[in-house]
């Protein structure tokens, strides 16, 4: 073999070696700079379960969502970045059109706060909740955890004790509003966030008002607000009047005798019942204010913030009776006279009987 031939051979071997050495890197860089194929923003939810936190499952998910055409390229980038269940952060992500594959993986990577670098928060709202079960159901629709997991957290006696609540009182912890949190936030973390919101809500000013109206704890105020709202959910102008009425009864040692409290005892059994009877009212139940003295052990509803403030700013008057007006206004007649209350109640019953008869 001539010297020239040897030189050509050596050059060829070196070239092949360099190509073999550089090809994986060239292949990676080509893949890393490829871009997503979606033409509009795509929301991706990566579950917390370990089996979902791997390259192949995520690649399949993105392909199904129309984000990828070249699954192999996406998997190659993930492998090169050593992505796995230990550093992939579950949660909600938004993939914008034309996002480089390397940037997608960088977004999924867990940071020091244990969130993904590009993880998005979600807005969580809950209103019109009659019970903790209702609340858990609403949360299940907006967050990763199911209602059973939330209920288990709500019933954790050690945690409730740490926060200073009984199970009956804990509905007062949850202030209806819209909050920002991560989709994969666990029930325990949700409760911790609500505890902070509760502390922020109960300012020194509100605590002073609480004492001024004769109540001792925020739970009592929310419990009374839940009764007020259950009596009147449409006309906010009546909230401070009704609150003042019940506070008068508490101060005078008169049972609250609120129909919504005994209805609460029956759960869904009275759903659709238009005329409440004595047999319904006579149920033995710690929430039935026809049977017990003072407030029930906890809220019968998660009342809006405005009703809680109406309790704290209750109207001063001498009313101790209220009765629905005999019309469709949804408002009430208030009085301090037992005789006048009987007249108001009779007028309402006559009107209701006539309306039911005409249907």
For each of these PLM feature ranges, what is it?
Residues 1-10, 45-51, 57, 64-68, ...:
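Intrinsic structural disorder
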Residues 1-40:
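N-terminal type II signal-anchor transmembrane helix
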Residues 4-8, 51-57, 140, 271, ...:
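A broad, low-specificity signal for short, low-complexity segments enriched in glycine/proline
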Residues 17-23, 68-70, 97-99, 151-158, ...:
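Short linear motifs at secondary-structure transitions and domain/linker junctions
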Residues 26-201:
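Signal peptide-directed extracytoplasmic domains
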Residues 125, 144-145, 159-359:
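Bacterial extracytoplasmic/cell-wall-associated proteins, especially those involved in peptidoglycan
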């Amino acid at each position: 073999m001539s010297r020239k031939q040897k030189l050509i051979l050596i050059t060829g071997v070196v070239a092949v070696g360099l190509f073999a050495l550089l090809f994986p890197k060239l292949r990676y860089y080509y893949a890393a700079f490829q871009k997503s194929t979606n033409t509009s923003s795509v929301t991706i939810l990566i579950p917390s379960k370990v089996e979902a936190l791997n390259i192949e499952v995520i690649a399949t998910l993105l392909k199904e969502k129309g984000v990828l055409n070249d699954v192999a390229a996406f998997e190659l980038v993930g492998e090169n970045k050593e992505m796995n269940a230990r550093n992939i952060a579950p949660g909600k992500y938004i993939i914008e059109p034309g996002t480089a594959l390397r940037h997608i993986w960088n977004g999924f990577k867990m940071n020091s706060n244990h969130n993904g670098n590009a993880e998005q928060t979600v807005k969580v709202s809950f209103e019109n909740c009659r019970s903790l079960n209702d609340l858990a159901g609403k949360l299940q629709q907006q967050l990763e955890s199911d209602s059973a997991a939330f209920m288990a957290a709500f019933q954790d006696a050690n945690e409730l004790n740490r926060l200073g609540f009984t199970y009956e009182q804990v509905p007062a912890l949850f202030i209806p509003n819209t909050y920002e949190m991560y989709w994969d936030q666990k029930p325990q973390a949700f409760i911790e966030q609500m505890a902070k919101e509760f502390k922020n809500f109960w300012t020194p000013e509100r605590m002073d008002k609480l004492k001024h109206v004769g109540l001792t704890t925020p739970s009592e105020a929310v419990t009374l607000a839940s009764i007020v709202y259950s009596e009147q959910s449409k006309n906010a102008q009546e909230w401070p009047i009704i609150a003042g009425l019940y506070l008068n009864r508490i101060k005078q040692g008169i049972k609250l005798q609120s129909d919504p409290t005994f209805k609460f005892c029956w759960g869904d059994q009275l759903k659709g019942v238009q005329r409440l009877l004595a047999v319904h009212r006579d149920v033995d139940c710690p929430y039935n204010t026809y049977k017990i003295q003072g407030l029930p052990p906890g809220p019968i509803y998660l009342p809006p913030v405005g009703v809680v403030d109406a309790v704290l700013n209750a109207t001063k008057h001498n009313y101790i009776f209220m009765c629905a007006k005999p019309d469709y206004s949804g408002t009430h007649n208030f009085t301090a006279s037992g005789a006048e209350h009987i007249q108001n109640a009779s007028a309402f019953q006559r009107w209701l009987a006539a309306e039911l008869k005409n249907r």
